[in-house]
Amino acid sequence: MPRRLFPISLVLLLLLLALAAFPAFPAWAFSLTGEENTLSQIRGLLDLAAGSIRPGLDLRPDTPIEHADVNPYGINTFLHQEVEPAKREKQVQLLAEAGFHWLRQEFPWYDIEISGKGNFEDCRFPPCHPAWDKYDQIVDLTEAHGLEIIARLSSPPSWTRADGDARGPFAPPDNFADYADYAAAVAERYKGRIRYYQLWNEPNIYPEWGEQAVNPESYTELLCAGYAAIKKVDPEAVVLAGALAP
């Protein structure tokens, strides 16, 4: 949380704690946050208040673009969660037959650089093997079926945070340079095979930025670090900001 917002947030917290004693508070807070638990309601109201006092976005006017003559149909996939390669192949085949062209496929950091920085071996279930193996197969399958991947780079391993998973498994790493190095490793391995990368997922909602308030300033810092790292190893790559929740 930016330092300038801390005193304001503290005052708001005290006010909300006082309001919570009134009988009408739960219904009012639920209407704004959708939460039923009192502490969750207070946290949601604090997030709303913090968002309302942040500087507004400085956006350029919309620029009309020509229609791109490409297949517009895509789907979220989690092919890495399928244990059996044959079933993974069948899923990709069905997606191609259904008319999809774009697969927004996660390349979760915790499943690639698993136990420490620079270690791309998976030893969770001996014998050890390269953590890249399943992702290599996913890329092979999409190419074989004429599909394209939008690689979602998210979900840090616990070693990237001094407090482990205390702030939740989706909390950002302590050092954004570690994220940049992971993003660069993925982009370098699949240079010329994956063109599109999306950095993080829904960083504007809880708990996608961890068990803490969302922080657009910090996310922007992470986005810039990842962008620079990917473009350095693959100048032709297209780097996308994380998809935002409505």
Indicate where each model-derived feature is located.
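Hydrophobic alpha-helical membrane-insertion segments, chiefly the h-region
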Residues: L15-A27
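Sequence-pattern detector for short linear motifs
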Residues: F6-P7, Q91, F107, S155
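Generic N-terminal simple sequence motifs
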Residues: R3, L19-F22, K231
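Substrate-binding cleft and catalytic face of glycoside hydrolase catalytic domains
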Residues: A98-E121, F125-P246
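Generic serine detector
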Residues: S9, P23, S31, S40, ...
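N-terminal Sec-pathway targeting helices
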Residues: M1-L14
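A generic alpha-helix propensity feature with a strong bias for hydrophobic helices
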Residues: L10, P26-A29, D111, N175
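N-terminal carbohydrate-binding accessory modules
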Residues: P26-W102, K117-N119, F125, D140-A144, ...
